[in-house]
Amino acid sequence: MILIGVVFTGDPRMQQVFRGNYGKAVRRGGGVPVFLPWKPEHAAFWAKHLDGFLFTGGGDPDPRYYGQSMRPECGTPTPARDEFELALLKAVMDTGKPVLGICRGEQILNVALGGTLIQDIPSQRPEAAGENHRDNEHRYAPDHPARVLPGTLLHSLMGRDELLTNSVHHQAVDTPAPGMRVCALSPAGIVEGIEATDGRFLLGLQWHPEAVAAVEERMQRPFTALVKASKEHKAQH
């Protein structure tokens, strides 16, 4: 049994659909999802006893964690979630266990490891204004292109140079953290994916594959790969 910790999104209106989408993607990949409340004091316990981790989408991380003042366009942070996720990531990094981050999950992974974010794409990267980064209408209908860089883990998983992604965000990775590299880019150069440079399974995706994984086999692959990597790590330790 491979136990995958899945961080709660926190929005009561979205809990059922997010639990369903994320949980079903983990189950289809052969894992058992364990949904994690925002309790920093439990981070070390989860890091020790679970096999892999899925950091989910949600609101904007507090810019102070990456050394910036908050811009007017930045969303209101959720301190409890920031504190829990940063504590959990710190504990997980010490174990070497696999991590997959989706949307906010990619962003908080980058922040936890020392990277920075674009707080608001429309105001800070106007050249990307036409890429529909907050297109809620297309959450379940991939139509946003992303170029997958050759020689990356993501490229080996997806088997394509370009993907059509469903994009619902206004923030993105700016400077990748030390030990992380860009693995996917939008046409305007917005980071759509990051991964570890040392070969361990640390993968962040800016789009929402969980929303379409039930009908698009390729979008299921990151979740299946997370479970596989978690199983392999467990067998080796």
Question: Where do the PLM segments sit?
Answer:
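N-terminal beta1-alpha1 cap of cysteine-dependent amidohydrolase-like domains
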Residues: M1-L100, V111-A112, I118, P122-M158, ...
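Conserved G/P- and acidic residue-centered "switch" motifs that form tight phosphate/ATP-binding loops
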Residues: C103
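Active-site-proximal beta-strand elements of phosphoester/diester hydrolases
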Residues: L203-Q206
